């Protein structure tokens, strides 16, 4: 199978390219929970890209940058693959708008650019694109690079879910998303001893709607706002257990916003598969 699609053949690409589903599905495990948005003005190329990615992801399409911008906001896909040269709004302009808007700044964007157009590559990186693929491109490489970005995001989410939070400043997110996570962490920590701190208060302090707060935290950390709050409470509790061997378990529970010690112990064991007392003994002996 000829795996390259050239920019000069865009108008008749379907005539020159036959998609073999088995090759793609063998490369990447299908996951229909992943939404991918393809933004491409050429109908033939849009059809080919759809046929490639629909084998592994849930695919949506847009015919230009303006439509892509609107669909990205409503769909909240896990990935956008976009051509650069399009009518109404270019892929570069769309990418810049996506990456500068808190509602969509977390969505990875891969741009397709013509070969030997280094200015497009530079502009794409400057507008915040996560990757770029030059035409003519190898379909297997396109699929692999898109999948790598998606899997990297999933691995980061799993670290948060496992209460193994990485340092925000070390995360491969853009400045808007890093600031959002740092602000969210600071707000939760400021209410850390308050058992009545809830998602409504969290959203108000973040100056966000509850829906946007949920969308952002879920996309960046894999956690709901309630899970994010709980994980930070537990993380602070583990630090206290390690650093203060004389602190009572009940006092630690109340200090970090748990309404009663029993609830704290249950949450701690669910998260770390060990009780707070056993956790303290483990680190005291290490």
Q: What do these predicted regions represent?
A:
Residues 137-146, 150:
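C-terminal output helix
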Residues 219-259, 282-286:
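Terminal helix-turn-helix DNA-binding modules in bacterial transcription factors
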Residues 86:
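Receiver (REC) domain active-site loop signature in two-component systems and cognate sites
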Residues 47-52:
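Charged docking surfaces used in two-component/phosphorelay signaling
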Residues 61-79, 242-244:
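Acidic, metal-coordinating helix/loop segments flanking the phosphotransfer/catalytic sites
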């Amino acid at each position: 199978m000829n795996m390259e699609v050239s920019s000069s053949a865009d108008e008749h690409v379907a005539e020159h390219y036959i998609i073999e589903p088995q090759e793609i599905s063998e490369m990447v495990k299908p996951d229909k929970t992943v939404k991918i948005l393809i933004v491409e003005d050429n109908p033939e190329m849009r059809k080919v890209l759809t046929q490639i990615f629909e084998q592994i992801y849930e695919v949506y399409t847009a015919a230009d940058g303006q439509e892509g911008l609107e669909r990205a906001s409503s769909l909240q896909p896990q990935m956008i693959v976009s051509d650069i040269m399009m009518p109404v709004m270019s892929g570069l302009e769309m990418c810049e708008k996506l990456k500068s808007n808190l509602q969509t700044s977390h969505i990875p964007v891969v741009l397709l650019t013509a070969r030997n157009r280094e200015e497009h590559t530079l502009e794409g990186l400057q507008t915040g694109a996560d990757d770029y693929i030059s035409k003519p491109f190898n379909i297997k490489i396109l699929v692999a690079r898109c999948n790598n970005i998606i899997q990297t995001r999933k691995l980061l989410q799993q670290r948060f879910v496992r209460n193994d939070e990485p340092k925000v400043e070390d995360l491969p997110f853009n400045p808007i998303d890093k600031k959002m996570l740092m602000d969210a962490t600071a707000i939760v920590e400021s209410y850390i001893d308050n058992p009545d701190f809830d998602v409504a208060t969290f959203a108000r302090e973040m100056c966000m709607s509850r829906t946007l707060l949920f969308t952002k935290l879920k996309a960046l950390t894999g956690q709901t706002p309630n899970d994010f709050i709980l994980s930070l409470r537990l993380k602070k509790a583990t630090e206290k257990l390690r650093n203060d061997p004389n602190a009572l378990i009940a006092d630690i529970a109340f200090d970090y916003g748990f309404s009663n010690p029993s609830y704290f112990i249950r949450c701690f064991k669910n998260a770390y598969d060990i009780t707070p007392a056993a956790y303290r003994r483990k680190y005291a002996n290490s």
